[in-house]
Regions:
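C-terminal structural cap/anchor segments
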Residues: 418-421, 425-532, 536-537
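N-terminal periplasmic/intermembrane-space "pro-region" immediately following the signal or transit peptide
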Residues: 18-171, 410, 414, 426, ...
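Membrane-embedded beta-strand positions of outer-membrane beta-barrel proteins
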Residues: 112-118, 175-179, 232-234, 268-270, ...
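Outer-membrane beta-barrel channel domains
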Residues: 37-40, 92-103, 128, 134-280, ...
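Predominantly the C-terminal beta-signal and adjacent terminal strand-loop region
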Residues: 421, 441, 550-591
């Protein structure tokens, strides 16, 4: 027989049914009921459990596990496998600087994080001419040279010491310290802007160290077997009132009680904060005074919010928020580090003012099926001792709404956005209807790649305030988002936008956004500029960004972005026909 024929016969024999190994027809399948404890999901009934042996072998004997079964700690398991420990490598073996094993004792862990955030930006936007001096003495216009370049470096360091388990149970104690080292270099075309003194020139270079976190967190108790808990946190701490930073996102000093219930389905925050004075140029907390009390503003925020997962839809989290802002900064004027008046704002009557405003809000974030959805709505009410243009008490009544819906199509995510903030239609009456936040940092409509959100657009010729502040979406007419007071006599905003994210590769993402912007009401701008009419159409905000992650992680992130505002009639009424734009490069290195 040939070798080929033998191979064919062997293949046929291997493929034929192994009848000799089949169980006899009278062989039954033996099942053994299990009587011991059974793991089950909360709220689900316990069903009968049987083990059925189909291979003709005697079934294994089932029995309960012992009451206590010793399992080695994870760091001992990793060490026994022989992985090397290198402090500079956060991923290999046990790294004591990353909390992989105890730093001392049995359950004291230490964690260090270092982030270098470097940004270079070149931009052109409306820039006022200095009152006393100019780089172009022959110019007659109130709008000067638009060119601006800046380099900003932030070294964010974080040191955490905590006691307790590191998996399911919250730590018993946590001590956190977050110093940030800043260097800023700015060069403008005009004098009298980097500093109020025009002899300071057109360039400013300086550094600053801010404390963005310094707190202790004490775990008070566990309230369920699934580690629902209550904790209290005291000190300088980060806080966000909602999902996207529309109302209040800051690092104030305060006390916060927080916790969870029903297997983390309910979450709550109850807190009282006093805001900290900021460094003018870096925006970081400034506690360089004699003690912390000198650095605290007479500006208090009381916050309560409640989260519920899977409400009203599976995968969608709802939140209700009640936030009160009490401001009593009317004693004396406040001059910022560059010599400019910040409180009260240099607009309208320019009188010191106080206010009490309460925000009642609903926020939601999650998905409904394949549709990703974020919504936010606030109603602000209260009173202020004097309005911006009237030296008399005014009642605050204003609203805000934002929504962003998106859907994934394979490697593409398409987005649609709408934002509405009410404006004041009569700046001389006894009502303030323009919505303003406490300290916003919105993550919507392109966020800081959007021109209108990223840039400080000054109201030239109507007071030393900005139509739209830096990293802010609201047209609030404030001199400074970080140091100024809220202003409820403003033109408001209407935004409608489309955008898309393209995950070209796991390392490369392309994002595009196009937003149409309008003022809600223009009466306050017309009063400030003594100019009428001013059209509502601000223009089209177009932005493009590329994000590259060479390690497919957040350790190295390079971002390039370009944005521009195509002027609408309202923008041209204020600033002329020039098209403002911004180009930036951002590099983040994280350890």
């Amino acid at each position: 027989m040939s070798v080929r024929a033998s191979s064919v016969l062997l293949a046929l024999w291997l493929a034929s049914p192994a009848t000799a190994q089949e169980p006899a027809a009278n062989d039954g399948i033996e099942c053994v009921p299990y009587e011991g404890p059974v793991r089950r999901r909360p709220g689900r009934p316990v069903l009968p459990v049987e083990y059925c042996e189909t291979e003709g072998l005697p079934p294994a004997v089932w029995g309960p596990l012992p009451e206590f079964a010793a399992v080695p700690d994870r760091w001992r398991i990793v060490s026994s496998l022989g992985y090397p420990e290198r402090l500079w490598d956060p991923y290999s073996g046990n790294n004591v600087l990353k909390g992989d094993r105890p730093a001392f004792g049995e359950d004291w862990f230490f964690f260090v994080s270092l982030i270098s955030d470097s940004t270079f930006e070149s931009r052109e936007l409306p820039t006022p001419v200095s009152i006393t001096s100019s780089t172009d003495p022959g110019a007659l216009d109130i709008i000067g040279g638009p060119g601006q370049t800046m380099f900003i470096e932030n070294l964010i360091t974080e040191f955490v010491l905590y006691k307790g388990d590191t998996v399911f149970k919250p730590p018993d104690y946590e001590f956190r310290f977050i110093p940030v080292f800043n260097y800023t270099s700015v060069e403008l075309d005009e004098r009298g802007l980097v500093k109020v003194d025009p002899t300071s020139g057109t360039t400013r270079r300086e550094g600053f160290v801010g404390i963005q976190g310094l707190f202790i967190d004490k775990h008070l108790r566990d309230v369920s077997e699934r580690y629902d808990f209550d904790s209290v946190r005291v000190g300088i701490q980060p806080i966000t009132a909602d999902f996207r930073g529309f109302l209040f996102q800051d690092s104030p000093f305060g006390i916060r009680l927080f916790g969870t219930r029903d297997n983390n389905r309910w979450q709550y925050n109850l807190a009282a904060f006093r805001r900290i004075e900021k460094d003018t140029n870096s925006g970081l907390n400034d506690i360089t005074e004699n003690d912390l009390s000198d650095a605290l503003r007479d500006d208090d925020v009381y916050l309560f919010n409640l989260y519920r997962q899977d409400l009203p839809f599976l995968g969608f989290t709802s939140q209700v928020a009640l936030v009160h802002n009490r401001n009593r900064e009317s004693d004396e004027p406040f001059i910022d580090d560059n010599g400019f008046l910040v409180r009260p704002a240099a607009i309208g009557t320019q009188r010191p003012r106080e206010y009490d405003v309460t925000y009642l809000g609903y926020n939601g974030d999650g998905h409904i099926g394949r549709l990703n959805l974020t919504v936010s709505a606030y109603y602000a009410f209260g009173d202020e001792s004097s309005a911006t243009f009237v030296d008399a008490q005014s009642d605050i009544s204003a609203g805000f709404f934002a929504a962003e819906a998106s859907r994934d199509f394979d490697w593409i995510r398409a987005r649609a956005t709408v934002v509405y903030a009410t404006g004041d239609d009569d700046p001389f009456d006894d009502e303030s209807n323009g919505f303003d936040a406490i300290f916003e940092n919105p993550l919507i409509a392109g966020a800081d790649t959007s021109f209108w959100i990223r840039q400080f657009v000054p109201l030239i010729g109507g007071g030393r305030v900005a139509v739209s502040g830096q990293n802010g979406i609201l047209n609030s007419l404030r001199p400074s988002k970080t140091q100024g007071q809220s202003n409820f006599t403003n033109p408001g905003l209407l935004l409608a936008g489309l955008g898309a994210d393209f995950d070209l590769t796991p390392k490369l993402r392309l994002s595009m956004n196009a937003n149409q912007l309008w003022f809600d009401k223009t009466a306050s701008i017309e009063a400030a500029r003594n100019q009428a009419p001013v059209a509502r159409d601000i223009g089209q905000d177009l932005s493009l960004s590329v994000i590259y992650r060479p390690l497919t992680s957040q350790n190295i992130v390079l971002r390039l972005a370009a944005s521009a505002l195509i002027p609408g009639q309202g923008y041209r009424d204020l600033y002329g026909d020039e098209t403002p734009f911004s180009l930036l490069a951002n590099l983040v290195l994280a350890y």
